[in-house]
Amino acid sequence: MLQLLSGNPRTVDALGFLLAFALTALMDSVFHDKLPHDHGRAFAVNGELSKGKARGSGLIFVLCIALVTLAVVPFKAEYVIYTVLLIASMLSGYFDDAAETAWNEYKKGLIDLVIAVVAGVTYLNFNGTEVNFLSWSFSLPYAVYLILIIVLIWASINVVNCTDGVDGLSASVAVVTIGTYLLAYKTELAEYGTAGVVFMGALLAYLWSNAKPSSLLMGDAGSRAMGFFIAMLSLKCGHPFAFLLAAIVFIVDGSLGILKISLKRFLHISILKLSLIHISEPTRRSY
């Protein structure tokens, strides 16, 4: 482990960032033609332009992140569990990306719920129920905090997933969001801050191929994993309410997107056709 080779956390962070960037860039190049291809989104902004592009790069950069963090983050049971859940959230999106018929929202929502419950129980088992809000610190009843954690993780996965759809948008906002946590809570995050640096390195490598005009898309495999990771940063920094500010772009854009699609599908009402904010469909309609 690189932690054993250097006592300087900044050196470890730098090495982790460079490894994640280089490995992701290399794997994107090697496996680009082996990924499933996008068929466009029914209600996404310029969704037809995505047709034919390689989709599911999230599979590549999430696995690269997992491998690099094994080298730079101390081996602890809690982090290993979160890494398994990160991969699970990625796989749920990747299998949907690769499916001939898109998974319905209820199926993916149930998978997200299971992941959120396991992550919530794990977090409370290792960290307790203390919460920080501004300058105050207090404890919540176990059941109450567990419910709030489940809501946070489930919502984060879905609003981030909904924001994906425009070249470079979702990954760029994720880099800014993760960077915000690192600037504000690097000490509190400890090794999770290092994981955040690794995540940013992988995303920046992905953006090399995703910046407009893109040739590669992360798909649900990437966006769902990003949502899970951002939620875990919110919890591990000890300030879960910081999510409301750090992820404000995801919250606004994703929530409006979910509202738009819900009204379109269930009430046949079309709104927000033109907006200064990107509003995308959270899932594919049909292939």
Residue positions per predicted region:
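"…together with the soluble PPM/PP2C metallo-phosphatase catalytic core" -> "…together
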Residues: 2-252
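Active-site-proximal helix/loop capping residues that flank conserved catalytic or ligand/cofactor
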Residues: 33, 202, 257, 277-278
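Charged/polar, solvent-exposed surface patches and flexible loops
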Residues: 33, 37, 261, 281
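Short alpha-helical segments used as structural interaction elements across diverse proteins
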Residues: 52, 105, 257, 281-282
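Membrane-proximal soluble regions of multi-pass membrane proteins
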Residues: 250, 254-277
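Single conserved hydrophobic/aromatic residue that forms the stacking wall/gate
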Residues: 277-278, 282-287
